[in-house]
Structures are given as structure tokens and as C-alpha cells.
């Protein structure tokens, strides 16, 4: 049996559900501002469900997301708030690691909008330098193209922390990134670029297993954490979308999601958890299944 790292679930959607506020383009960043302490509470609930990682609520804190909003000048302060909430939860829980989350520039699922390399590396570096001193890991999330992978590794790996590269794949063909490029082609980029693990994230559960199979050539740890959306809609691919463009799957119970996760573990995944719409109940069910199968959660 294996040692499995159990990630937390989806912070952003969990905050949306708890706050009950109408979603805005600032998404979870807005809720962190409007509801102090709610992010800490979500982190604590994921820890209580046996997650061993708290992923910072920093995915969407980029200059391009803040431009034209009342918090345009709060880039650094927002990162510090996200770190404070995660560290507070870990302290109160008594254990766990903190993963500093870095999301895509400009928009999720839009590799066509990724900036030129020089600009992208500089922007990612600015985020990574804010997060790294307070984190155990940097997790580069929803990486949708090979250029995105190269650029974010160039920005994060030199800081000296383990860097987990999390790729997002085509929901209909998990062997392909959302750019259309082959997942397998990300393996040498990750290995040569200094990544410590390759994950698949923010894709349908059904797409994760083919993606993991496409990573079979790597010597790095692999893993996955899916979302619970029916599909990524055209409306969500517009400029400055809100999550009310997306719909939760009806078959996304903790039990059914854990079924998917256990197939990934059986295929060699050693880092698992959840993305958007995966809550503490899903993580608790995964923990129960892992232990029942004799795995150790680390």
C-alpha cells in the first residue's frame, strides 16, 4: 500500500456556497474581503476532513484580475491575507502543510490568452516571491499549455521550494491539454524544469485517468484533483466571467467522487484531492476509502 498526500478541495466554490453572495469576477478574492475568517474556517474544515495540505486562496490574485476594481492596489496585501488565513488554520489544527496556489494569468482555460514568455515569467515570479516565504510547496494550477508550463516553472523553481505542476486537460480527451497539445509532451518540460510532481486538476473526473496514463513516462510523483462542473461553458470563457456560468453535476456525491479518486490511486497517483465543487465531505470520504484500502495519508 502507498503513502498518499491528501489535498484539500475547492476553496473558491466552497466560499461561494457559504457566503451566499452573488458571484463577482473577483470570485473567492471578493469573499475573502467581505467575510473575514471564512477562508480560515474552510481550511480548518478541510483539515478536519483529513486533508494534509491547505492550498492558499491566492489562485485568482493577479494584477490582470484586479485591474479596474476597488482593490487594484492591494495585490501584495491580498496575498498576505490569503497566507494569514491558511497559516491560522494550520496553527489551530496543529499540523499540515501550506501550498501556495498560483493560477493562470488573464483567465482560466484560455491558453490563447497566455502572455509572451518574458511577461509571464515576470508576473508569475512576483506572485511566487510573495507566497514562498510562508509556504511549504508552490502549486501551479490549471496549467493549460506547454508554454504556460515552461513559464511558471521558470518563475517558481528557482525559489527553492517543491513545485507541483497541475495541468488542466480537455474534458473530452484527457490525453490533451486544453491547448490541444499532448499531455505526454509536458513530462520532459516538468522534469527538465525542476517540478517535484505532476498533477491533473480542474477537469472532469472522467478525464483524469486518461491524463494520468499519459504521464506514465515520468519518474515524478503524479496525482489528480477534479472539478464537479458539468462542463466549461462558452459563457465562462468570456472576458471576466463569474462562476454562475457553471453548473454543478448531479452525480457529484462524495461517494461517487471517491470512486473516481480510488481508480487514480490504483493507477499510481500518490497526490489526490479536489478542485471546484469538492467540499470537506468529499475529502472525508476519500480519506475513509484510502485508509480502508490500507493506504497511509501523509
Task: Please report, for each region that a protein language model flagged, where it lies by residue.
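Domain-level signal for soluble alpha/beta catalytic cores
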Residues: 1-298
Amino acid at each position: 500500500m502507498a503513502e498518499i498526500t491528501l489535498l484539500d478541495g475547492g476553496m473558491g466554490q466552497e466560499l461561494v456556497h457559504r457566503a451566499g453572495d452573488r458571484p463577482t469576477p473577483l470570485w473567492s478574492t471578493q469573499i475573502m474581503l467581505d467575510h473575514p475568517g471564512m477562508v480560515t474556517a474552510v481550511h480548518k474544515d478541510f483539515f478536519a476532513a483529513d486533508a494534509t495540505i491547505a492550498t492558499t486562496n491566492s489562485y485568482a490574485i493577479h494584477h490582470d484580475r484586479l485591474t479596474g476594481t476597488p482593490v487594484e492596489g492591494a495585490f501584495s496585501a491580498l496575498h498576505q491575507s490569503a497566507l494569514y488565513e491558511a497559516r491560522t488554520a494550520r496553527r489551530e489544527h496543529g499540523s499540515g502543510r501550506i501550498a501556495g496556489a498560483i493560477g493562470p494569468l488573464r483567465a482560466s482555460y484560455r491558453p490563447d490568452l497566455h502572455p509572451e514568455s518574458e511577461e509571464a515569467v515576470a508576473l508569475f515570479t512576483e506572485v511566487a516571491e510573495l507566497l514562498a516565504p510562508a509556504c511549504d510547496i508552490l502549486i501551479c494550477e490549471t496549467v493549460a499549455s506547454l508554454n504556460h508550463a515552461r513559464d511558471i516553472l521558470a518563475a517558481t523553481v528557482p525559489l527553492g521550494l517543491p513545485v507541483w505542476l497541475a495541468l488542466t486537460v480537455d474534458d473530452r480527451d484527457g490525453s490533451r491539454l486544453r491547448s490541444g497539445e499532448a499531455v505526454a509532451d509536458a513530462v520532459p518540460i516538468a522534469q527538465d524544469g525542476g517540478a517535484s510532481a505532476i498533477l491533473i486538476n480542474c477537469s472532469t473526473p472522467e478525464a483524469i485517468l486518461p491524463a494520468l496514463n499519459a504521464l506514465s513516462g515520468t519518474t515524478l510523483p503524479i496525482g489528480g484533483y477534479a472539478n464537479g462542473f458539468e462542463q466549461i461553458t462558452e459563457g465562462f470563457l468570456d472576458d471576466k466571467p463569474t462562476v454562475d456560468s457553471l453548473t454543478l453535476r448531479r452525480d457529484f456525491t462524495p461517494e461517487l467522487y471517491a470512486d473516481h479518486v480510488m481508480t487514480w490511486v490504483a493507477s499510481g497517483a500518490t497526490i489526490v484531492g479536489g478542485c471546484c465543487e469538492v467540499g470537506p465531505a468529499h475529502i472525508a470520504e476519500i480519506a475513509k476509502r484510502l485508509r480502508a484500502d490500507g493506504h497511509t495519508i501523509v
